Amino acid sequence: MGMTKKLREKWNEALQAVLPIIAIVLVLCFVIAPISSSILLCFLLGAVLLLAGMMLFTLGAELAMSPMGERVGTCLTKSRKLPVVIGLSFLLGFIITISEPDLQVLANQVPAVPNMTLILSVACGVGAFLVVALMRMLFSVALPPLLLVFYGVVFVLAMFVPKAFLSVAFDSGGVTTGPMTVPFIMALGVGISATRSDRHAADDSFGLVALCSIGPILAVMILSMIFKADSSAYTPPVIPEIGDSKELFLLFARELPVYMKEIAVSLLPIILFFMIFQIFMLKLTTRKLKKIAIGLVYTYAGLVLFLTGVNVGFMPAGNYLGQVLAKSAHPLFLVPIAMIMGYFIVKAEPAVYVLNKQVEEITDGAISSKAMGMGLSLGVAVSLGLAMVRVLTGISILWFLIPGYAIALGISFFVPKIYTAIAFDSGGVASGPMTAAFLLPMAQGACSALGGNIVTDAFGVVAMVAMTPLITIQVMGLASRIRAKRGAQEGMSAARGQSGAYAAFELLDDDAIIEL
């Protein structure tokens, strides 16, 4: 397929994902929640950048990030030296986390803990859990018991974490698995499982993001107790005031270099890590390297445009919409509106496209992209509804997370293994930049307008979005298992009926059969 045709295909996919969000926001602006022309213009230009960014990023991930991850994973497994695998896995997890742009944002929300201490601790957490995830794959250890143990530790620690810090701690799991790291980590799993020939290899292709998401939560919780952090910080987004088209252009032009630098810093360690593998182990042909290089350029340009559009155009719009809806005569409308937004907005998360495509390929179409998309959308819709209930009532996040994870972990022992791994991966994937830069500001704006505690009541949206897909995707798996059993039983009944008919014929002589 030519590059122009591929770009057109990715553009159509981006349109399908983003147009519903634009339509919903415009309907809200013109019918229910009027906003200033400055915010609306920023939103519309941000939407154009988001569309272009998504198109380029999805193509770049396909050409570069996924092949790089798969080849590194295959290479790691073939080394056959456990200390080397452990050391390189930890280093890889550490490097790709420390360069994640959203980690700096998280660090700024925790003023009691020095930024560098928090960043290094979270990076170590991801590195350690990436090692655990790879060891699980290499030694074919079941995922549900591991998740039960580690989440058990998380919720025991939650009892000792300051209340004002709890939501931020749980948000950290989704924040640090961003669009830069997720495609690479997921492809790493595919590369490792490809070297195995047993029947559970496909099941173990997933689960890396699931375990890596736990590391930051534990790291942030432990730090909050060590430093006795009793508060976290919230800086409201600046609502832009645009006088003319030139000011609109300058607003985006000022922010563009910031994201160019951030994404360059994020991509560079991954490229260097891959080049070390290329020099000493992979030795790919010039043609393959050229294809990866082109893919990296697309990835870079796509993420720069995407993050500029989301953070400059979408964040102020989300915050202001939340304020207007909360101040309206019917603030309860926040719940259904947030659910509708959540249903569609997850489709615009860059890493969700990568996850859905990979799931369809690994399962040979048994779990389709459409089914995955539906499961994620329903999960995020429920999570946004619950998040707005928290904003309106001030209920502690633990009243939602403990039952939610208890259900998710309980179901995991009864569904096909691959569904559990995909479900827990999808939690980290769904809670990406669209959630952090549009849905979270919307909750913060609503909470601010209602006079609530933003730190305890509005933070936690990312954690809620990361939780509900664990249940919805596994319910899909449970339904598929029930259907398979029912089909098998019907097949056996039909076979028994058929064999009974043959037996009846055998009792008759030839003349009797002719008469029949």
Regions found by a protein language model. Name each.
Residues 62-80, 105-111, 314-329, 351-367, ...:
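Flexible loop linkers connecting adjacent transmembrane helices
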Residues 130, 134-140, 165, 190-204, ...:
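Alpha-helical transmembrane segments
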Residues 21-25, 53, 81-89, 149-160, ...:
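Small-residue-rich segments of transmembrane alpha-helices in multi-pass membrane proteins
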Residues 17, 43-55, 112-124, 171-185, ...:
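Structural signature of hydrophobic alpha-helical transmembrane segments
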Residues 41-42, 60, 107-119, 136-152, ...:
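Transmembrane helix-loop boundary segments of multi-pass membrane transporters
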Residues 82-153, 331-412:
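Helix-loop-helix junctions within the multi-pass membrane cores of secondary transporters/permeases
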Residues 160-168, 219-228, 306-313, 385-386, ...:
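Hydrophobic alpha-helical transmembrane segments in multi-pass integral membrane proteins
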Residues 1-59, 74-75, 173, 186, ...:
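Signature of multi-pass transmembrane helix bundles
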